[in-house]
């Protein structure tokens, strides 16, 4: 069983496989995911080994059916693997139950989605406070941290605006501020520019690059090569396997 009583990063990292760098944030070994679709068994991921270190900016790419969405769901603790192991910041999450996964998800991961996922009747400030409500933070802590997070993404003068009073780029900035407010180990962005025009997309990617320069670990899931080019490392999935990793230029046949 996975240890759930270990609280310090050093203790958790000591339990990682010996060949894993001590600054690894994400480690997968032989990660597999299968689905039953009618009478057909679909192998969405087929033995993925991946290590992502602290303060990396990584793009996971691939065409439709490559397994990138499945990989995102597993990395984000939204799903569990059929086989294999997954460690997130030292937590062996591949063996955790639903309640423990939910706690890890809220603590360790900041999500940014293509469709923003903002509450339409709530202000930008209230939207950013939401993850801290789930974390049990006090009202003052929520307000102070949400204000700081919105200021960090350039929306210090838009805190009281509702989503329909903001542009698409501003709404995505609110979503990024919300993702950052709990100081997550990783920022996980799923097609974050998919609903934005090219100029606004460049602005959002520039923001990601600034956050990365400030020390944030970022994982970007995209099918767009020009967006992936902003990352410092690109991992290409094909047919559920790693076909290319720009950090090693290894091509799997």
Region roles according to the model:
Residues 22-238, 242:
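ABC family nucleotide-binding domain
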């Amino acid at each position: 069983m996975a240890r759930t009583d270990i609280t310090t990063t050093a203790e958790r990292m000591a339990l990682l496989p010996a060949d894993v760098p001590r600054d690894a944030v994400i480690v997968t070994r032989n990660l597999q995911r299968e689905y039953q679709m009618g009478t057909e068994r679909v192998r969405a991921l087929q033995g993925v080994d991946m290590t992502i270190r602290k303060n990396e900016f990584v793009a996971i790419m691939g065409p439709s059916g490559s397994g990138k969405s499945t990989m995102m769901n597993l990395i984000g603790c939204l799903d569990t693997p059929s086989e294999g192991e997954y460690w997130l910041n030292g937590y062996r999450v591949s063996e955790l139950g639903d309640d423990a996964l939910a706690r890890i998800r809220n603590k360790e991961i900041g999500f940014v989605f293509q469709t923003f996922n903002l509450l339409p009747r709530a202000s930008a400030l209230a939207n950013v406070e939401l993850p801290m409500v789930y974390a049990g933070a006090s009202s003052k802590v929520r307000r102070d941290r949400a204000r700081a997070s919105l200021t960090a993404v350039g929306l210090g003068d838009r805190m009281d605006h509702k989503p329909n009073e903001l542009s698409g780029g501003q709404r995505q900035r609110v979503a990024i501020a919300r993702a950052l407010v709990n100081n997550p180990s990783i920022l996980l962005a799923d097609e974050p520019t998919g609903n934005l025009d090219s100029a606004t997309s460049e602005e959002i990617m520039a923001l990601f690059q600034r956050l990365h320069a400030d020390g944030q670990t970022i994982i970007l899931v995209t099918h767009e090569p020009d967006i992936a080019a902003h990352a410092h490392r690109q991992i290409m999935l094909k047919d559920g396997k790693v076909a290319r990793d720009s950090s090693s230029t290894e091509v799997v046949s």
